[in-house]
Amino acid sequence: MIMRMSSLFVRTLREDPADAEVPSHRLLVRAGYIRRAAPGIYTWLPLGLRVLRKIENVIREEMDAIGAQEMLFPALLPREPYEATNRWTEYGDGIFRLQDRKGADYLLGPTHEEMFTLVVKDLYSSYKDLPLSIYQIQTKYRDEARPRAGLLRGREFVMKDSYSFDVDDAGLDVSYQKHRDAYVRIFDRLGFEYVIVEAMSGAMGGSKSEEFLAKASVGEDTYVRCTLCDYAANVEAVHSPPIPPVPYDDAPAAHAEQTPDTPTIETLVAHLNERFPREDRPWAASDTLKNVVFSVHHPDGATEALAVGLPGDREVDAKRLEAHLGEGVVFEPFGEADFAARPTLAKGYIGPGALGEKKPAGVRYLLDPRVVEGTRWVTGADAAGSHVIDLVAGRDFSGDGLIEVAEVRDGDPCPRGDGGTLETARGIEMGHIFQLGRKYADALDLKVLDEQGKLVTVTMGSYGIGPSRAVAAIAEGTHDELGLAWPREVAPADVHIVATGKDEHVFAAAERIAHELDKQGVEVLYDDRPKVSPGVKFKDAELIGVPTIVVVGKGLAAGTIEVKDRRTGQRQDVPADHLVDRVIAIVRA
């Protein structure tokens, strides 16, 4: 096919859009791939739609190759299936809800586990029907509170979601591995750097879960890698290596001390070193126990107070806490009104003595795993200007449970205990695969008869990829200072022909080259605009980012045509009579 710039519905921009936060957003708008319709909602222009469709086709080919079958569900979904799994409530404000004229409740589909489960339940009843893998590529909707970064965090997005159905866990393992292998092939073909990391299941439920992250400094996801082994995990899924209990038979008794004007860890440590110096080493923030209290609002309207106890040199990671609390839960640190309602909590001096579900304040108290039995701490004495020294975990206090929400830092030990340390990096979530198990099958009563004629609950896997997000992720990973630079597999065209000058022979030669390439199945973007300067055409070619640029211009008089590699910048002058063969060889290499 030949796309002509003179008639193509595109308008390139020289200035960055005012709301662009990341390079992919800026360049996709400037190059005429997408246009903003509303916050988090974008229109796909012809060039952008071509890239999106190519990504979808790569996904489709690899899904078909493992025997998955494509289908399509509606985007407008009834309330009842989501009530059965409790996700109508769990999603909270995160979904778009609406009613028809009769008052019946619906939602715009954020994900389709329930619908896939029900259609299989309607049609299949025997183990002989399984295993089964089915998928769709469809638009999803989520009411993001803060849509940002263009296509990376939107309210409307395209997603491929597939589901496997097996009669037992061994079958699920096989289906999961097939999908995982297919995802590796998909991301290898899409042409950007990625990493596979352990992940949390979140609202999806289930057990084993992995994410495919595009490496990107602008990514919203933080992940860690071990410096020695192959361990990699989303920061939300990182677990601290087990710490053995510390003997405390000889530990001194806990004692309260006056520590005026020390409501922060920094002021407390300074006071300790001034008033209670130690011979072996100075006091440090890691010697203190920080107790951070949150007001937690659940989607069903319930509110609770939650305290997290962690070493004073660590902060609570909001994303880790969000992942722990679940979909639709909103939280914020205790405010003045919250403290006023619980007078036993002394702001800046909160200690374990006032915390716990059975204490008067009724605050659920969860401890970081580093607060192991026998460890000694300095922490609040539940009175202004006072702290307790030598408070021993397990002897003097305990929590209602454990929670892993402290920030993960470079240099932390690898959870595998191999002596390696963790290093952090940023990425964009491109794919997420889950072993759902029987969560949705149980909720929706999906059962089949096994070989013995006994009803058994089907076990499921869920596998998602975001094609629209992939457009942005690829742009993030491959752009340069001049513009986009697409991998050939997903580029809107194979070749961008630029005819320069006003010579009719130049345009005639460019036209002939375009047709000859088209006959050979090469996709051509042809800049045939007669009244546009060469400089503007060159800038547009660099901005649009087609992988091979052919410049037909002044070299034609000498019998040569320039061929440029967009990603490397390498140029070569090719004899005009060999040009088509050379370009075809480049495209098909």
From Swiss-Prot:
Q: What name does UniProt use for this protein?
A: Proline--tRNA ligase
The coding gene here is proS
Q: Which PANTHER family match?
A: MITOCHONDRIAL RIBOSOME PROTEIN L39/PROLYL-TRNA LIGASE FAMILY MEMBER, PROLINE--TRNA LIGASE
Q: Which InterPro entries match?
A: aa-tRNA-synt_IIb, aa-tRNA-synth_II, aa-tRNA-synth_II/BPL/LPL, Anticodon-bd, Anticodon-bd_dom_sf, Pro-tRNA-ligase_IIa, Pro-tRNA-synth_IIa_bac-type, Pro-tRNA-Synthase_IIa_type1
Q: How does it assemble?
A: Homodimer.
Q: Which GO terms describe its biological process?
A: prolyl-tRNA aminoacylation
Q: Name one Pfam family in it.
A: HGTP_anticodon
Species this protein is from: Nocardioides sp. (strain ATCC BAA-499 / JS614)
Would you tell me the Gene Ontology cellular component terms? cytosol
Quoted from the entry, the domain comment is: Consists of three domains: the N-terminal catalytic domain, the editing domain and the C-terminal anticodon-binding domain.
Tell me, what does this protein do in biology? Catalyzes the attachment of proline to tRNA(Pro) in a two-step reaction: proline is first activated by ATP to form Pro-AMP and then transferred to the acceptor end of tRNA(Pro). As ProRS can inadvertently accommodate and process non-cognate amino acids such as alanine and cysteine, to avoid such errors it has two additional distinct editing activities against alanine. One activity is designated as 'pretransfer' editing and involves the tRNA(Pro)-independent hydrolysis of activated Ala-AMP.
Q: Which family does it belong to?
A: Belongs to the class-II aminoacyl-tRNA synthetase family. ProS type 1 subfamily.
Q: Report the EC number(s), separated by commas if there are several.
A: 6.1.1.15
Q: Which UniProt keywords apply?
A: Aminoacyl-tRNA synthetase, ATP-binding, Cytoplasm, Ligase, Nucleotide-binding, Protein biosynthesis
